[in-house]
Amino acid sequence: MEDYVKIEKIGEGTYGVVYKGRHKSTGQVVAMKKIRLESEEEGVPSTAVREVSLLQELKHPNVVRLLDVLMQESRLYLIFEFLSMDLKKYLDSIPSGQYMDPMLVKSYLYQILEGIYFCHRRRVLHRDLKPQNLLIDNKGVIKLADFGLARAFGVPVRVYTHEVVTLWYRAPEVLLGSPRYSTPVDVWSTGTIFAELATKKPLFHGDSEIDQLFRIFRTLGTPNNDVWPDVESLPDYKNTFPKWKGGSLSSMVKNLDKNGLDLLAKMLIYNPPKRISAREAMTHPYFDDLDKSTLPAACINGV
C-alpha cells in the first residue's frame, strides 16, 4: 500500500469504498477498491485472495484491468485502472428528449459483448453486470468492471452502506433460485442494458425480487415448462404466479430497429441454454454496419 497515495473518495461500490489514487513512483492514476467483507473479524479468506489474484490475468481492452491485489491489516485493496465515468452517469447526463446516437449504442453493445466473450472463454462469470460497473472513456471505449468479484466475495443482498443491490439486471434463473447457473446470466443482464442504452430507462425496474419477476413476466409472458423446461421445479417458482401472455417488448423499446429488437429478444430468451451466447450475438446482423476495425479490440482479433 505504501506504493500508492489516496487522492479522494470517488464512490461506494458493492464491496466498499472506492478511492482515486496514484502510484507514487510511476504517477499512474488508479482506482483503489477497499473490500469490506461480512466476517471482518476473521480477515480476508485465502480463497477470496486466490480467486481475485487470478483476475489479474484478464487482459482485454474492454475489461478494466486489475493491476494489483494488496493486503493492509487484514483489509484487501484491489487496484484497478482508472476511468472517470460510468454508463449510468453518462445516461443520466443526456438531456431530456435526447437519446444516445444509435451507432454509439451499437458500438458500446458490441464492446460489452467482446469483454464478456473474453471472460466467458476463460470461465469467468460476472453475475452482477449493471450500468454502474460499465466504465467509459472519452474516446468511445467501454470497459467492464468487477468481473469475477462475485465468485471471490459473493453477491451481497445489501451494499455495506445498507443500500439494496439492484435486481433490475438480474437473470430470471437467478431470481427463481436456480442453484446452477452459468454464462447466460451475463447475456440476460447485457440485454437489459442494451434496452437501457436505447431508451435511457431501465427495462425492468422492480423494487423486490417478486416485483422484478412480475415485471419480466408481464413483458415476456409468465414462463412454464413448455418454454423453459423444468422452470416450474426451480426453488422460487410458484404455480400461483399470474399467467401473463407477454409480447410487449417492441412497445417498450421504441428506439431499436428490427435487427436490434431481434437481437434483444434473443438475449432475453427464458431458457438459458437457448439464450444467445456473447459470441453468437457478435455475429448478429444488427452489427453488420458497425466498423469493427475502429474498436479497441480490433488489434487482438485481427479484424
UniProtKB/Swiss-Prot annotation:
EC code(s) of this entry: 2.7.11.22, 2.7.11.23
InterPro entries attached to this UniProt entry: CDK, Kinase-like_dom_sf, Prot_kinase_dom, Protein_kinase_ATP_BS, Ser/Thr_kinase_AS
Reactions that this protein is recorded to catalyse: L-seryl-[protein] + ATP = O-phospho-L-seryl-[protein] + ADP + H(+); L-threonyl-[protein] + ATP = O-phospho-L-threonyl-[protein] + ADP + H(+); [DNA-directed RNA polymerase] + ATP = phospho-[DNA-directed RNA polymerase] + ADP + H(+)
Active site positions: 128
Keyword set includes Oxidoreductase: no
Regulation: Phosphorylation at Thr-14 or Tyr-15 inactivates the enzyme, while phosphorylation at Thr-161 activates it.
Name assigned to this protein: Cyclin-dependent kinase 1
Organism: Oryzias luzonensis
Gene that specifies this protein: cdk1
